[in-house]
Amino acid sequence: MADQFYLENIDEFVTDQNKIVTYKWLSYTLGVHVNQAKQMLYDYVERKRKENSGAQLHVTYLVSGSLIQNGHSCHKVAVVREDKLEAVKSKLAVTASVHVYSIQKAMLKDSGPLFNTDYDILKSNLQNCSKFSAIQCAAAVPRAPAESSSSEKLEQSDPPVSPEMQASDELTTNGHGPPVPKQSSQQPKGIMGMFASKAASKAQDANKETKTEAKEVMNSEKNNENLLLSGYWESMIVLFQAQCINKLKVNLDSEQEVKEEKKVEQPPLSVTEPKLAAPVDLKKSSKKAEPVRMQQKEKKRRKQMELSDDETKETENMKKKRRRIKLPESDSSEDEVIPDSPGAYEAESPSPPPPSPSPEPVLKTEPEPPPVKGSDGENKRKRKRVLKSKTFTDEEGCMVTEKVYESESCTDSEEELKMKTSSVHRPPAMAVKKEPKEERKGPKKGTAAMGKANRQVAITGFFQRK
Protein backbone atom coordinates (compact mmCIF):
# COMPACT_ATOMS: atom_id res chain seq x y z
CA MET A 1 0.00 0.00 0.00
CA ALA A 2 2.80 2.37 0.83
CA ASP A 3 4.49 1.76 -2.51
CA GLN A 4 1.22 2.47 -4.32
CA PHE A 5 0.79 5.71 -2.40
CA TYR A 6 4.30 6.84 -3.32
CA LEU A 7 3.75 6.04 -6.98
CA GLU A 8 0.58 8.12 -7.00
CA ASN A 9 2.53 11.02 -5.52
CA ILE A 10 5.18 10.74 -8.23
CA ASP A 11 2.49 10.67 -10.94
CA GLU A 12 0.91 13.80 -9.47
CA PHE A 13 4.29 15.63 -9.41
CA VAL A 14 5.15 14.69 -13.01
CA THR A 15 1.82 14.83 -14.86
CA ASP A 16 -0.25 17.34 -12.89
CA GLN A 17 2.37 19.78 -11.58
CA ASN A 18 4.77 19.29 -14.55
CA LYS A 19 7.82 19.13 -12.29
CA ILE A 20 11.26 17.65 -12.78
CA VAL A 21 11.49 14.86 -10.18
CA THR A 22 15.04 13.83 -9.26
CA TYR A 23 15.90 11.10 -6.77
CA LYS A 24 17.43 13.68 -4.37
CA TRP A 25 14.36 15.90 -4.51
CA LEU A 26 12.07 12.90 -4.00
CA SER A 27 14.06 11.58 -1.01
CA TYR A 28 13.94 14.97 0.80
CA THR A 29 10.27 15.57 -0.10
CA LEU A 30 8.99 12.13 0.96
CA GLY A 31 11.63 11.57 3.67
CA VAL A 32 12.99 8.31 2.24
CA HIS A 33 16.50 7.00 1.57
CA VAL A 34 18.13 7.89 -1.73
CA ASN A 35 18.37 4.25 -2.82
CA GLN A 36 14.65 3.81 -2.15
CA ALA A 37 13.89 6.97 -4.12
CA LYS A 38 15.86 5.63 -7.10
CA GLN A 39 13.93 2.34 -6.92
CA MET A 40 10.60 4.18 -6.76
CA LEU A 41 11.42 6.20 -9.90
CA TYR A 42 12.44 3.05 -11.77
CA ASP A 43 9.18 1.25 -10.79
CA TYR A 44 7.10 4.28 -11.85
CA VAL A 45 8.71 4.34 -15.32
CA GLU A 46 8.21 0.61 -15.85
CA ARG A 47 4.55 0.63 -14.79
CA LYS A 48 3.70 3.77 -16.73
CA ARG A 49 5.17 2.40 -19.95
CA LYS A 50 3.41 -0.94 -19.50
CA GLU A 51 0.04 0.75 -18.94
CA ASN A 52 0.41 3.29 -21.74
CA SER A 53 3.09 2.75 -24.33
CA GLY A 54 2.56 6.26 -25.77
CA ALA A 55 3.15 8.06 -22.46
CA GLN A 56 5.36 11.12 -22.82
CA LEU A 57 8.07 10.49 -20.26
CA HIS A 58 11.70 11.56 -20.61
CA VAL A 59 14.16 9.84 -18.29
CA THR A 60 17.76 10.71 -17.44
CA TYR A 61 20.15 8.11 -16.00
CA LEU A 62 23.11 8.27 -13.64
CA VAL A 63 25.87 6.06 -15.07
CA SER A 64 29.14 5.25 -13.30
CA GLY A 65 32.07 3.04 -14.26
CA SER A 66 35.78 2.83 -15.00
CA LEU A 67 37.26 4.51 -18.07
CA ILE A 68 40.75 4.34 -19.58
CA GLN A 69 41.90 7.85 -20.65
CA ASN A 70 45.44 8.82 -21.81
CA GLY A 71 46.71 5.42 -20.73
CA HIS A 72 45.34 5.86 -17.18
CA SER A 73 42.22 4.26 -15.69
CA CYS A 74 39.70 6.62 -14.06
CA HIS A 75 36.23 6.39 -12.51
CA LYS A 76 33.58 8.32 -14.44
CA VAL A 77 30.12 9.39 -13.25
CA ALA A 78 27.79 10.97 -15.82
CA VAL A 79 24.15 12.05 -16.14
CA VAL A 80 22.92 11.15 -19.63
CA ARG A 81 19.63 11.09 -21.50
CA GLU A 82 17.94 7.84 -22.38
CA ASP A 83 18.80 8.10 -26.09
CA LYS A 84 22.54 8.41 -25.31
CA LEU A 85 22.70 5.74 -22.59
CA GLU A 86 24.01 2.93 -24.77
CA ALA A 87 26.73 5.12 -26.32
CA VAL A 88 28.09 6.05 -22.89
CA LYS A 89 28.00 2.42 -21.70
CA SER A 90 30.04 1.34 -24.71
CA LYS A 91 32.81 3.81 -23.81
CA LEU A 92 33.14 2.52 -20.25
CA ALA A 93 35.50 -0.38 -19.66
CA VAL A 94 33.49 -1.54 -16.64
CA THR A 95 29.93 -0.30 -15.85
CA ALA A 96 29.48 -0.04 -12.08
CA SER A 97 25.88 1.22 -11.79
CA VAL A 98 22.96 2.60 -13.81
CA HIS A 99 20.20 4.42 -11.89
CA VAL A 100 17.24 6.63 -12.82
CA TYR A 101 18.30 10.19 -12.03
CA SER A 102 15.15 12.17 -12.99
CA ILE A 103 11.77 11.95 -14.71
CA GLN A 104 10.10 14.84 -16.59
CA LYS A 105 7.55 15.36 -19.36
CA ALA A 106 9.72 17.66 -21.54
CA MET A 107 13.02 16.81 -23.16
CA LEU A 108 15.96 18.56 -21.51
CA LYS A 109 18.49 20.36 -23.71
CA ASP A 110 21.10 20.64 -20.95
CA SER A 111 21.62 19.86 -17.26
CA GLY A 112 20.70 23.36 -16.01
CA PRO A 113 17.16 22.54 -14.82
CA LEU A 114 18.42 19.43 -12.99
CA PHE A 115 21.00 21.48 -11.10
CA ASN A 116 18.40 24.10 -10.11
CA THR A 117 15.98 21.53 -8.66
CA ASP A 118 18.71 19.85 -6.57
CA TYR A 119 20.18 23.22 -5.51
CA ASP A 120 16.88 24.51 -4.15
CA ILE A 121 16.11 21.37 -2.11
CA LEU A 122 19.66 21.12 -0.70
CA LYS A 123 19.63 24.78 0.31
CA SER A 124 16.44 24.31 2.28
CA ASN A 125 17.92 21.22 4.06
CA LEU A 126 21.50 22.40 4.43
CA GLN A 127 21.90 21.34 8.08
CA ASN A 128 20.66 17.80 7.36
CA CYS A 129 22.08 17.33 3.88
CA SER A 130 23.48 13.84 4.66
CA LYS A 131 20.42 12.58 6.52
CA PHE A 132 19.15 10.35 3.68
CA SER A 133 22.49 9.84 1.95
CA ALA A 134 24.09 6.45 1.31
CA ILE A 135 27.57 7.76 2.21
CA GLN A 136 28.22 7.74 5.93
CA CYS A 137 31.34 8.78 7.89
CA ALA A 138 31.47 8.46 11.68
CA ALA A 139 34.37 10.92 11.96
CA ALA A 140 32.38 13.67 10.22
CA VAL A 141 31.02 15.71 13.14
CA PRO A 142 29.56 19.24 12.79
CA ARG A 143 31.83 21.93 14.21
CA ALA A 144 30.98 24.51 16.82
CA PRO A 145 30.22 28.08 15.64
CA ALA A 146 33.40 29.44 17.31
CA GLU A 147 35.58 26.96 15.46
CA SER A 148 33.89 27.73 12.14
CA SER A 149 34.50 31.49 12.55
CA SER A 150 38.20 30.94 13.42
CA SER A 151 38.65 28.66 10.41
CA GLU A 152 37.11 31.30 8.15
CA LYS A 153 39.63 33.87 9.41
CA LEU A 154 42.52 31.50 8.77
CA GLU A 155 41.28 30.84 5.24
CA GLN A 156 41.13 34.58 4.55
CA SER A 157 44.68 35.09 5.86
CA ASP A 158 46.14 32.26 3.71
CA PRO A 159 48.06 33.51 0.65
CA PRO A 160 46.28 33.13 -2.69
CA VAL A 161 47.19 30.18 -4.83
CA SER A 162 49.32 31.05 -7.85
CA PRO A 163 47.76 30.60 -11.31
CA GLU A 164 50.45 28.07 -12.23
CA MET A 165 49.34 25.82 -9.36
CA GLN A 166 45.69 26.20 -10.41
CA ALA A 167 46.55 25.22 -13.96
CA SER A 168 48.41 22.14 -12.73
CA ASP A 169 45.42 21.18 -10.55
CA GLU A 170 43.00 21.53 -13.45
CA LEU A 171 45.13 19.28 -15.66
CA THR A 172 44.91 16.38 -13.20
CA THR A 173 42.05 13.95 -13.78
CA ASN A 174 41.01 11.62 -10.92
CA GLY A 175 44.44 11.88 -9.29
CA HIS A 176 46.35 11.21 -12.51
CA GLY A 177 48.12 13.99 -14.35
CA PRO A 178 51.19 14.64 -16.41
CA PRO A 179 54.46 13.85 -14.64
CA VAL A 180 55.82 16.83 -12.74
CA PRO A 181 59.50 17.51 -13.51
CA LYS A 182 61.54 16.85 -10.39
CA GLN A 183 63.88 19.61 -9.36
CA SER A 184 67.44 18.45 -8.87
CA SER A 185 68.18 18.61 -5.18
CA GLN A 186 71.92 18.51 -5.71
CA GLN A 187 73.56 21.03 -7.99
CA PRO A 188 76.20 19.66 -10.38
CA LYS A 189 79.72 20.29 -9.32
CA GLY A 190 82.65 21.76 -11.22
CA ILE A 191 82.34 23.37 -14.63
CA MET A 192 78.76 22.09 -15.22
CA GLY A 193 77.61 23.73 -12.01
CA MET A 194 79.05 27.07 -13.09
CA PHE A 195 77.27 26.93 -16.44
CA ALA A 196 74.00 25.92 -14.80
CA SER A 197 74.14 28.83 -12.34
CA LYS A 198 74.94 31.26 -15.15
CA ALA A 199 72.01 29.99 -17.23
CA ALA A 200 69.62 30.38 -14.28
CA SER A 201 70.86 33.91 -13.58
CA LYS A 202 70.49 34.82 -17.26
CA ALA A 203 66.92 33.54 -17.30
CA GLN A 204 66.06 35.60 -14.21
CA ASP A 205 67.70 38.69 -15.71
CA ALA A 206 65.76 38.21 -18.95
CA ASN A 207 62.47 37.98 -17.03
CA LYS A 208 63.31 41.13 -15.09
CA GLU A 209 64.25 42.99 -18.27
CA THR A 210 61.00 42.04 -20.00
CA LYS A 211 58.99 43.23 -16.99
CA THR A 212 60.90 46.53 -16.80
CA GLU A 213 60.52 47.06 -20.55
CA ALA A 214 56.78 46.45 -20.33
CA LYS A 215 56.52 48.97 -17.48
CA GLU A 216 58.58 51.51 -19.43
CA VAL A 217 56.36 51.07 -22.49
CA MET A 218 53.24 51.63 -20.40
CA ASN A 219 54.74 54.72 -18.77
CA SER A 220 55.86 56.12 -22.13
CA GLU A 221 52.37 55.59 -23.58
CA LYS A 222 50.82 57.40 -20.62
CA ASN A 223 53.32 60.25 -20.96
CA ASN A 224 52.58 60.54 -24.68
CA GLU A 225 48.85 60.71 -23.96
CA ASN A 226 49.42 63.40 -21.35
CA LEU A 227 51.64 65.36 -23.73
CA LEU A 228 49.05 65.12 -26.49
CA LEU A 229 46.31 66.32 -24.16
CA SER A 230 48.43 69.18 -22.84
CA GLY A 231 49.44 70.20 -26.38
CA TYR A 232 45.82 70.12 -27.49
CA TRP A 233 44.68 72.35 -24.64
CA GLU A 234 47.59 74.74 -25.19
CA SER A 235 46.69 75.08 -28.88
CA MET A 236 43.06 75.72 -27.97
CA ILE A 237 44.09 78.42 -25.48
CA VAL A 238 46.31 80.08 -28.09
CA LEU A 239 43.45 80.09 -30.60
CA PHE A 240 41.06 81.69 -28.09
CA GLN A 241 43.64 84.34 -27.21
CA ALA A 242 44.22 85.13 -30.89
CA GLN A 243 40.49 85.48 -31.48
CA CYS A 244 40.13 87.83 -28.50
CA ILE A 245 43.07 89.96 -29.70
CA ASN A 246 41.59 90.19 -33.20
CA LYS A 247 38.23 91.28 -31.78
CA LEU A 248 39.92 93.98 -29.69
CA LYS A 249 41.87 95.20 -32.73
CA VAL A 250 38.70 95.39 -34.83
CA ASN A 251 36.90 97.33 -32.10
CA LEU A 252 39.82 99.78 -31.74
CA ASP A 253 40.02 100.28 -35.50
CA SER A 254 36.28 100.92 -35.73
CA GLU A 255 36.46 103.46 -32.88
CA GLN A 256 39.37 105.27 -34.54
CA GLU A 257 37.52 105.38 -37.85
CA VAL A 258 34.44 106.83 -36.15
CA LYS A 259 36.58 109.50 -34.46
CA GLU A 260 38.29 110.39 -37.74
CA GLU A 261 34.94 110.63 -39.50
CA LYS A 262 33.64 113.00 -36.82
CA LYS A 263 36.76 115.16 -37.10
CA VAL A 264 36.62 115.19 -40.88
CA GLU A 265 32.89 115.97 -41.08
CA GLN A 266 33.37 119.39 -39.43
CA PRO A 267 35.94 121.05 -41.78
CA PRO A 268 34.12 120.56 -45.13
CA LEU A 269 31.31 122.97 -44.10
CA SER A 270 33.79 125.64 -43.10
CA VAL A 271 35.92 125.07 -46.19
CA THR A 272 33.15 125.12 -48.81
CA GLU A 273 31.53 128.36 -47.60
CA PRO A 274 34.53 130.63 -48.14
CA LYS A 275 35.16 129.00 -51.49
CA LEU A 276 31.68 129.95 -52.63
CA ALA A 277 31.85 133.36 -51.03
CA ALA A 278 35.14 134.59 -52.48
CA PRO A 279 36.45 132.56 -55.42
CA VAL A 280 38.22 135.59 -56.95
CA ASP A 281 40.40 136.16 -53.86
CA LEU A 282 41.50 132.52 -53.85
CA LYS A 283 42.61 132.76 -57.49
CA LYS A 284 44.77 135.80 -56.73
CA SER A 285 46.39 134.20 -53.70
CA SER A 286 47.04 130.97 -55.63
CA LYS A 287 49.12 132.83 -58.23
CA LYS A 288 51.31 134.32 -55.52
CA ALA A 289 51.90 131.10 -53.58
CA GLU A 290 52.08 128.38 -56.24
CA PRO A 291 54.78 126.20 -54.63
CA VAL A 292 52.96 126.13 -51.31
CA ARG A 293 49.70 125.43 -53.11
CA MET A 294 51.14 122.37 -54.85
CA GLN A 295 51.91 120.75 -51.53
CA GLN A 296 48.47 121.60 -50.22
CA LYS A 297 46.86 120.10 -53.33
CA GLU A 298 48.62 116.81 -52.77
CA LYS A 299 47.38 116.74 -49.18
CA LYS A 300 43.87 117.67 -50.27
CA ARG A 301 43.80 114.88 -52.84
CA ARG A 302 44.56 112.38 -50.14
CA LYS A 303 41.91 113.85 -47.90
CA GLN A 304 39.35 113.93 -50.71
CA MET A 305 39.79 110.21 -51.26
CA GLU A 306 39.02 109.65 -47.58
CA LEU A 307 36.20 112.21 -47.41
CA SER A 308 34.43 111.12 -50.59
CA ASP A 309 32.18 108.74 -48.68
CA ASP A 310 31.32 111.39 -46.08
CA GLU A 311 30.51 114.01 -48.75
CA THR A 312 28.20 111.61 -50.57
CA LYS A 313 26.35 111.03 -47.30
CA GLU A 314 26.03 114.81 -46.75
CA THR A 315 24.71 115.38 -50.27
CA GLU A 316 22.11 112.66 -49.74
CA ASN A 317 21.01 114.31 -46.48
CA MET A 318 20.84 117.72 -48.23
CA LYS A 319 18.71 116.23 -50.98
CA LYS A 320 16.33 114.84 -48.41
CA LYS A 321 16.00 118.26 -46.74
CA ARG A 322 15.19 120.00 -49.98
CA ARG A 323 11.65 121.00 -50.65
CA ARG A 324 9.61 118.30 -52.20
CA ILE A 325 7.19 119.62 -54.81
CA LYS A 326 4.23 117.41 -55.59
CA LEU A 327 2.26 117.98 -58.77
CA PRO A 328 -1.27 116.60 -58.98
CA GLU A 329 -2.45 114.55 -61.89
CA SER A 330 -3.72 116.53 -64.84
CA ASP A 331 -7.44 117.12 -64.60
CA SER A 332 -9.30 116.91 -67.88
CA SER A 333 -12.47 118.55 -66.60
CA GLU A 334 -13.64 121.58 -68.52
CA ASP A 335 -13.81 125.08 -67.12
CA GLU A 336 -17.07 126.04 -65.56
CA VAL A 337 -18.86 129.20 -66.69
CA ILE A 338 -20.78 130.91 -63.92
CA PRO A 339 -22.84 134.11 -64.39
CA ASP A 340 -22.06 137.24 -62.41
CA SER A 341 -23.50 137.38 -58.96
CA PRO A 342 -23.38 140.24 -56.42
CA GLY A 343 -22.47 137.92 -53.51
CA ALA A 344 -19.20 136.22 -52.85
CA TYR A 345 -18.63 132.96 -54.75
CA GLU A 346 -17.70 129.67 -53.14
CA ALA A 347 -14.43 128.01 -54.12
CA GLU A 348 -14.41 124.41 -55.20
CA SER A 349 -12.75 121.84 -52.99
CA PRO A 350 -9.16 121.14 -54.05
CA SER A 351 -8.32 117.71 -55.46
CA PRO A 352 -6.08 115.39 -53.37
CA PRO A 353 -2.36 115.70 -54.12
CA PRO A 354 -0.81 112.87 -56.17
CA PRO A 355 2.16 110.85 -54.83
CA SER A 356 4.54 111.56 -57.74
CA PRO A 357 6.75 114.64 -56.99
CA SER A 358 8.23 116.82 -59.74
CA PRO A 359 10.81 119.60 -59.37
CA GLU A 360 9.14 122.00 -61.85
CA PRO A 361 7.11 124.67 -60.04
CA VAL A 362 5.61 126.04 -63.31
CA LEU A 363 2.02 127.24 -63.28
CA LYS A 364 -0.21 125.36 -65.67
CA THR A 365 -3.57 126.59 -66.84
CA GLU A 366 -6.18 124.65 -68.71
CA PRO A 367 -7.15 125.72 -72.22
CA GLU A 368 -9.60 128.57 -72.17
CA PRO A 369 -12.92 128.10 -73.89
CA PRO A 370 -14.24 130.94 -76.03
CA PRO A 371 -15.85 133.74 -74.08
CA VAL A 372 -19.52 133.25 -73.44
CA LYS A 373 -21.75 136.17 -74.06
CA GLY A 374 -25.10 136.71 -72.52
CA SER A 375 -28.32 137.59 -74.25
CA ASP A 376 -27.67 141.30 -73.71
CA GLY A 377 -24.29 141.01 -75.52
CA GLU A 378 -22.23 141.69 -72.38
CA ASN A 379 -19.30 139.54 -71.39
CA LYS A 380 -20.11 137.32 -68.42
CA ARG A 381 -17.61 136.61 -65.68
CA LYS A 382 -16.32 133.06 -65.91
CA ARG A 383 -14.51 130.85 -63.41
CA LYS A 384 -11.25 129.18 -64.24
CA ARG A 385 -9.29 126.42 -62.51
CA VAL A 386 -5.73 127.51 -61.86
CA LEU A 387 -2.80 125.45 -60.50
CA LYS A 388 -1.47 127.08 -57.34
CA SER A 389 1.30 126.06 -54.95
CA LYS A 390 0.81 125.59 -51.21
CA THR A 391 3.71 125.26 -48.78
CA PHE A 392 3.60 123.42 -45.45
CA THR A 393 5.88 121.45 -43.13
CA ASP A 394 5.56 117.66 -43.05
CA GLU A 395 6.07 115.28 -40.11
CA GLU A 396 9.85 115.19 -40.66
CA GLY A 397 10.10 118.97 -40.42
CA CYS A 398 10.80 119.55 -44.12
CA MET A 399 9.19 122.29 -46.20
CA VAL A 400 6.89 120.76 -48.83
CA THR A 401 5.13 122.55 -51.68
CA GLU A 402 2.11 121.03 -53.36
CA LYS A 403 0.33 122.12 -56.52
CA VAL A 404 -3.44 122.35 -56.13
CA TYR A 405 -6.08 123.36 -58.64
CA GLU A 406 -8.24 126.27 -57.43
CA SER A 407 -11.08 128.04 -59.19
CA GLU A 408 -10.79 131.78 -59.89
CA SER A 409 -13.06 134.25 -61.62
CA CYS A 410 -11.46 136.05 -64.52
CA THR A 411 -12.32 138.55 -67.30
CA ASP A 412 -10.62 139.42 -70.56
CA SER A 413 -8.38 141.98 -68.86
CA GLU A 414 -7.31 139.49 -66.22
CA GLU A 415 -6.50 136.90 -68.89
CA GLU A 416 -4.15 139.32 -70.56
CA LEU A 417 -2.36 139.99 -67.25
CA LYS A 418 -1.95 136.26 -66.62
CA MET A 419 -0.50 135.71 -70.06
CA LYS A 420 2.12 138.32 -69.21
CA THR A 421 2.90 136.73 -65.87
CA SER A 422 3.27 133.32 -67.51
CA SER A 423 5.86 134.81 -69.88
CA VAL A 424 7.72 136.18 -66.85
CA HIS A 425 7.61 132.78 -65.12
CA ARG A 426 9.17 130.84 -67.96
CA PRO A 427 12.87 131.75 -67.40
CA PRO A 428 12.90 130.61 -63.74
CA ALA A 429 11.44 127.29 -64.86
CA MET A 430 14.42 126.74 -67.11
CA ALA A 431 16.70 127.49 -64.18
CA VAL A 432 14.88 124.93 -62.04
CA LYS A 433 15.31 122.28 -64.72
CA LYS A 434 19.05 122.84 -64.68
CA GLU A 435 19.33 122.04 -60.99
CA PRO A 436 19.98 118.28 -61.33
CA LYS A 437 22.78 118.96 -63.85
CA GLU A 438 24.45 121.34 -61.44
CA GLU A 439 24.15 118.78 -58.65
CA ARG A 440 25.88 116.20 -60.80
CA LYS A 441 28.92 118.44 -61.28
CA GLY A 442 29.97 118.05 -57.68
CA PRO A 443 29.13 118.65 -54.04
CA LYS A 444 30.74 122.11 -54.12
CA LYS A 445 28.06 123.56 -56.47
CA GLY A 446 25.21 121.89 -54.59
CA THR A 447 24.79 124.64 -52.00
CA ALA A 448 24.71 127.38 -54.66
CA ALA A 449 22.11 125.47 -56.65
CA MET A 450 20.01 125.08 -53.50
CA GLY A 451 20.09 128.81 -52.92
CA LYS A 452 18.99 129.56 -56.50
CA ALA A 453 16.15 127.07 -56.28
CA ASN A 454 14.89 128.64 -53.04
CA ARG A 455 14.98 132.10 -54.62
CA GLN A 456 13.08 130.92 -57.70
CA VAL A 457 10.39 129.26 -55.59
CA ALA A 458 10.00 132.43 -53.55
CA ILE A 459 9.65 134.57 -56.73
CA THR A 460 7.02 132.27 -58.25
CA GLY A 461 5.08 132.25 -54.99
CA PHE A 462 5.20 136.05 -54.92
CA PHE A 463 3.68 136.34 -58.41
CA GLN A 464 1.01 133.78 -57.64
CA ARG A 465 -0.13 135.62 -54.54
CA LYS A 466 -0.74 138.75 -56.61
Swiss-Prot record:
GO terms for cellular component: cytoplasm; delta DNA polymerase complex. The modification Phosphothreonine is found at T411. The modification Phosphoserine is found at S308, S407, S409, S413. There is a cross-link at K259, K433 (Glycyl lysine isopeptide (Lys-Gly) (interchain with G-Cter in SUMO)). Residues 205-218, 255-265, 281-297, 432-441 have a biased composition (Basic and acidic residues). It is found in: Cytoplasm; Nucleus. There is a cross-link at K259, K262, K433 (Glycyl lysine isopeptide (Lys-Gly) (interchain with G-Cter in SUMO2)). A motif (PIP-box) lies at residues 456-463. The modification N-acetylalanine is found at A2. The PIP-box mediates the interaction with PCNA. This is DNA polymerase delta subunit 3. It comes from Bos taurus. The gene is POLD3.
